[in-house]
From Swiss-Prot:
Region (G2): 36-40
GO molecular function, one term: GTP binding
Protein name per UniProt: GTPase Era
Annotated region (G1), positions in chain: 10-17
Underlying gene: era
SUPFAM superfamilies named in the record: P-loop containing nucleoside triphosphate hydrolases, Prokaryotic type KH domain (KH-domain type II)
Family annotation (InterPro entries): G_ERA_dom, GTP-bd, GTPase_Era-like, KH_dom-like_a/b, KH_dom_type_2, KH_sf_prok-type, P-loop_NTPase, Small_GTP-bd
Gene Ontology BP term (one): ribosomal small subunit assembly
UniProt function note: An essential GTPase that binds both GDP and GTP, with rapid nucleotide exchange. Plays a role in 16S rRNA processing and 30S ribosomal subunit biogenesis and possibly also in cell cycle regulation and energy metabolism.
Organism taxonomic ancestry: Bacteria, Pseudomonadati, Campylobacterota, Epsilonproteobacteria, Campylobacterales
Length: 291
């Protein structure tokens, strides 16, 4: 029996959250084509044969001077020192520059490369990309082609990860899908619905705070605040006669209900907090692992 923690690292939009969801075969991690959709570290628990692997999905690595983005990168780097194995995720279409940047951080634990989205390319392109990574072979333990859409890739990746975990009793109940709090997951589903329903720029000025939860045997009651930075953005989030906010709520309610396996009553409010993305204390509260 082995058990350990695996930090998933990579640039924004490399497919980290989609990879976690495919390993779980459940929707846990927020998935969006927009950069830095993942703002908190989500712990997802995967049982592989008799072994327990706890994946930590981190914000994407990138370069930016904005306070929020700086804190996101700090969070990702910190997770590298708090794990047993690092899984570096890169798309088969990415250059190796992102991997070189990762190596410059001097990771101190073993790492494996997951070359993602291989179902979208041909064998010749895949072989060319593998040869590009070959010059770094002294650094990584293995490079594994992966597709989140094909289950046949799952076993090979998990088998490789387990090699580098220690013998240890389970850290979590094997029935659990995630060690992240339910509030974090509900928050991410609401934020994802904002990403899906609004233009590219607006979601970056928005955050979600869960104000109240009440869980009964047949009904989950949630109240949440959508934080945005201007009155004009507030108007866009609400929409004409509340249509946009209703659509966001409907989409989020469906996702939360699927996870909770019960009916959900979701009440959403929109609040303006100017310059929240530059308020370091507010951001640290948002990004706190225990939040």
């Amino acid at each position: 029996m082995k058990s350990g923690f695996v930090s998933i690292i990579g640039r924004t939009n490399a497919g980290k959250s989609t990879l976690i969801n495919s390993l779980l075969e459940e929707k846990i991690a927020l998935v969006s084509h927009k950069q830095n959709a993942t703002r908190r570290k989500i712990k997802a628990i995967v049982m592989h044969e008799k072994n327990q692997i706890i994946f930590i999905d981190t914000p994407g690595l990138h370069e930016s001077g904005a306070t929020l983005n700086q804190l996101l990168v700090q969070s990702a780097i910190k997770s590298m020192g708090d794990c047993d194995v690092i899984l570096f995720v890169a798309s088969v279409f990415d250059s190796t520059k992102d991997y070189e940047n990762f190596l410059s951080l001097n990771p101190q634990v073993p790492h494996i490369i997951a070359l993602n989205k291989v179902d979208l390319t041909d064998n010749a392109t895949l072989l060319k990309k593998l040869s590009e990574y070959a010059k770094f072979s002294q650094h990584f333990k293995a490079i594994i082609p992966y597709s989140s859409k094909k289950k046949s890739y799952k076993k090979g990746l998990l088998d490789e990860i387990v090699k580098y975990l220690d013998e240890h009793e389970y850290f979590y109940n094997p029935e659990f899908l995630s060690a992240s709090s339910e509030k974090e997951l509900y928050r991410d589903f609401i934020l994802e619905s904002i990403y899906e329903n609004l233009s590219d720029e607006l979601p970056y000025s928005s955050e979600v705070l869960i104000n109240r939860t009440k869980d009964t045997p047949n009904l989950l009651i949630l109240e949440a605040n959508i934080i945005t930075d201007t009155n004009s953005h507030k108007g866009m989030l609400i929409g004409k006669e509340g249509a946009t906010l209703k659509r966001i709520g409907k989409d989020a309610r469906f996702k939360i209900s699927k996870l909770a396996q019960k009916k959900v009553l979701l009440k959403l409010f929109v609040t303006v907090k100017k310059n929240w993305q530059k308020d370091e204390e507010f951001l640290k509260k948002l990004l706190n692992d225990e939040n």
